[in-house]
Amino acid sequence: MNSFSSNEYSTEISTEALNNWQQLVEQRISLELEYAAKLAKLTKSIKAIKQCAPLNDLTKQVCVELMQCNKKHLEASRYFQTHVKEFMKEYVDRENKFSNETISKSSAAALMTSMENFILFTNPVYHNKLQVPSKSDMEIANSLKITQPAEKNSGTANPISAYSLEHAELDERNNQLSEALSMLRLSPFVNNYYPSYQNRKDGKSLMENRGVVLSVDTVTSPISQSPKKLTPTTSPINSTSLSFVDAKKPGSKWPSQYDFPKKTKSTEIPFKTLPSLNINNERELTKHKLPIVKPKLAVFPSNQATASTLQLAPPPVQAIPTLRNPVNLDDKKESLLKYYATHPTITPDGFPIFAYVRALYAYKATLPSEIDLNVDDTLVVLNRQKDGWWKGLVVSPTVGRIGLFPSNYIEELEY
């Protein structure tokens, strides 16, 4: 037996209608949070796309519009949680505890207040149609289990279905979202730079999603920033010696201008060629002192052999290759001077040239990784480091080696 009198349960609103109302509010809160999360994800995906200059302002404006819609969905979820769901929680728990077919007058009044708070937020025009709880209001509450728009009853002056309560105010937010996404779909810049956007296989545009924001399949993952290791190469510009010992690696190849003889046995440990500086490896270039690879000297065993062994052992033969077609370094530098005089955008090795600069002051290298500068030297920039030390080489009046130089000693040239 509950403590409520029979007069308290004289209303015609069922307990099932009260539970249906709470379930509808919970679904609405869940949808608001889902929409907000999808809008935030879409904004993040748009910002992650590598944009060209004409699209920067457009994407920035679109992202602002999307985040405004995201903010409205979050505000709606907080409002429904505080003023609609939490307001009814005590009454719903109490009615379910006593398991009565109808609810008390106090619960009915709380239900009407909760519905009024919901309608005030979703569509204020319905507020003028609400009256003091009456028979028509009870019919409205009992109709909450209907999921489709109900037909207009002649006996009800102001019919309000669950469908109209849930979707009455979504048009305003969806229109704002559609305008933001239409900027991307209708922009001529998008058509020019991203033609695949208009040729989507599914044929669905973003502005057609009236309530549920679908993921954009044209968004590509950000370009990986991890450096790629390049195969060490040798260049006559970077090398100071033309004598190389044949590396004992199967399938190894040397530059075409060198013709080496066949391998010969030797007790000498072969020198390792110095790898060229990797332009794309930003992590190695962030340090002022670049690693200097020094050739290892040959180590021979201690002299403990017998006299007979020494007499029979042949003298060691050094595997020094002979150049059948020697390369004239002067001709090579002359060709490089002519090449850089045309101001190309890439080096002969295929690396990009970011700028041409002129030395304003003379600089004497203090580390092996640095290069000397003379006043009015012309250099090409192969890498700009954040610490102010740039990587490049002098190309006029002579061609030098690749190394680091201070960026405050130069001025950029325009060609």
From Swiss-Prot:
<dbReference type="GO" id="GO:0005829">
    <property type="term" value="C:cytosol"/>
</dbReference>
<feature type="modified residue" description="Phosphoserine">
    <location>
        <position position="235"/>
    </location>
</feature>
<feature type="domain" description="SH3">
    <location>
        <begin position="352"/>
        <end position="415"/>
    </location>
</feature>
<keyword id="KW-0833">Ubl conjugation pathway</keyword>
<feature type="modified residue" description="Phosphoserine">
    <location>
        <position position="226"/>
    </location>
</feature>
<dbReference type="InterPro" id="IPR001452">
    <property type="entry name" value="SH3_domain"/>
</dbReference>
<dbReference type="GO" id="GO:0006511">
    <property type="term" value="P:ubiquitin-dependent protein catabolic process"/>
</dbReference>
<feature type="modified residue" description="Phosphothreonine">
    <location>
        <position position="231"/>
    </location>
</feature>
<keyword id="KW-0597">Phosphoprotein</keyword>
<keyword id="KW-0728">SH3 domain</keyword>
<keyword id="KW-0967">Endosome</keyword>
<dbReference type="GO" id="GO:0005768">
    <property type="term" value="C:endosome"/>
</dbReference>
<dbReference type="Pfam" id="PF00018">
    <property type="entry name" value="SH3_1"/>
</dbReference>
<comment type="subunit">
    <text>Interacts with ubp4.</text>
</comment>
<dbReference type="GO" id="GO:0005737">
    <property type="term" value="C:cytoplasm"/>
</dbReference>
<dbReference type="InterPro" id="IPR027267">
    <property type="entry name" value="AH/BAR_dom_sf"/>
</dbReference>
<keyword id="KW-0963">Cytoplasm</keyword>
<protein>
    <recommendedName>
        <fullName>Ubp4-interactor sfp47</fullName>
    </recommendedName>
</protein>
<dbReference type="GO" id="GO:0030414">
    <property type="term" value="F:peptidase inhibitor activity"/>
</dbReference>
<dbReference type="InterPro" id="IPR036028">
    <property type="entry name" value="SH3-like_dom_sf"/>
</dbReference>
<comment type="function">
    <text>Required for the regulation of activity and recruitment of ubp4 to endosomes.</text>
</comment>
<feature type="modified residue" description="Phosphoserine">
    <location>
        <position position="221"/>
    </location>
</feature>
